[in-house]
């Protein structure tokens, strides 16, 4: 998830396609280059992990407008453009998992997103992310 978030974040400001970025970043060489920057890059992903990362990044890219619409809808009092890019990437990945990966429980997707956010964002932004994801699940999946 964390690598998928990094790549989704990178897609938000580069002109690369999701496929090209994945092909460039999911290599042993790329991981070796990034290993000193972040511990998540200590070892290149195996085939199963790489497939999961690809599914997330390609799905988030394909459904970006829909996911951003949900973020905008539940970010009460915030314009989407004001939300930090990392926070947006975290929420996009979690929402994609919730909407399109039914084998992942909603609570797990939210918890993982919040834990990753704690590594990169301020406590206030972590609460903001948790609040948006919680509202999204409560409202969109109300029985």
Protein language model regions, located:
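N-terminal interaction/assembly modules
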Residues: 1-126, 130-143
């Amino acid at each position: 998830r964390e690598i998928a978030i990094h790549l989704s974040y990178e897609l938000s400001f580069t002109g690369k396609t999701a496929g090209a970025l994945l092909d460039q970043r999911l290599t042993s060489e790329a991981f070796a280059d990034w290993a000193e920057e972040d511990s998540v890059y200590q070892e290149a992903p195996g085939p199963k992990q790489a497939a999961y990362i690809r599914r997330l990044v390609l799905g988030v890219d394909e459904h970006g407008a829909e996911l951003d619409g949900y973020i905008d809808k539940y970010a009460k009092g915030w314009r989407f453009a004001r939300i930090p890019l990392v926070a947006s990437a975290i929420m996009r990945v979690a929402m994609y998992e919730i909407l399109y990966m039914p084998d992942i429980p909603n609570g797990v997707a939210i918890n993982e997103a919040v834990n990753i956010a704690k590594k990169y964002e301020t406590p206030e932004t972590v609460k903001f992310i948790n609040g948006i994801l919680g509202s999204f699940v409560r409202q969109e999946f109300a029985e």
